[in-house]
């Protein structure tokens, strides 16, 4: 991979990850005793708000769980805010593998995915389908 593509969105090891909280967190304002005993976003009055499960090793082996977890988590939050309206939100972990440079098919840092999302956004899966491999050549400016 060319150097110009290798640093696309990557956080320097010297740069400290900062907290990106912009609103009060639930534990700061909720009374824990008022919470229900159980809660499952897969079944809220018959509605499943969570994104579908994916296999990071299809079509080939790729250790990209570090990209799949955060993109699914963010997509779930979008589906919840949108009250699961169609179309379902599915964010592209392949863009993260291609651009974020906080990892590859050999592993990575999920915390950097959230920083990348905050700085650049993450497009939907239709922008860059998951191919389970490191890019041979890919320009992140193609998707932004």
Regions found by a protein language model. Give the residues of each.
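Catalytic-core signature of thiol
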Residues: 1-144
């Amino acid at each position: 991979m060319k150097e110009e593509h290798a640093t696309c969105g990557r956080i320097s090891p010297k740069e400290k990850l900062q907290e990106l909280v912009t609103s009060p967190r639930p534990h700061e304002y909720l009374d824990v005793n008022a919470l229900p005993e159980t809660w499952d976003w897969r079944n809220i009055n018959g509605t499943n708000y969570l994104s579908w499960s994916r296999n990071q090793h299809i079509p080939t082996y790729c250790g990209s769980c570090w990209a799949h977890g955060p993109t699914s988590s963010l997509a779930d939050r979008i589906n919840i805010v949108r009250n699961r309206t169609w179309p379902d939100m599915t964010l592209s972990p392949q863009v993260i593998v291609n651009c974020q440079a906080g990892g590859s098919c050999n592993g990575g840092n999920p915390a950097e995915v959230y920083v990348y999302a905050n700085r650049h956004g993450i497009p939907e899966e239709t922008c860059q389908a998951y191919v389970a491999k490191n890019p041979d050549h890919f320009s992140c400016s193609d998707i932004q």
